[in-house]
């Protein structure tokens, strides 16, 4: 079976590192990614996709990323769930990044 996702987009929010109770570093990276087709107005709609970064990937992204930076993210889609206050299950997916590539030079 294969669970792989590749995204190329622009950084919308800077990743901020935090630590889990077990001491692992984690950050979230919000990307704006163009859809691969044009809408009725001839423009590309955009999706905002939250990526979770762990350990060294989180550390390097937090020091290099700037708002508007073009980055590539390779990772996997992870399904999660929790029970709401009224005991109903809530399901969501997140992108867990295994690698972040910085696609612009630092001077850009």
What are these regions, as identified by a protein language model?
Residues 1-108:
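Single-stranded nucleic acid-binding surfaces, predominantly the OB-fold ssDNA-binding core
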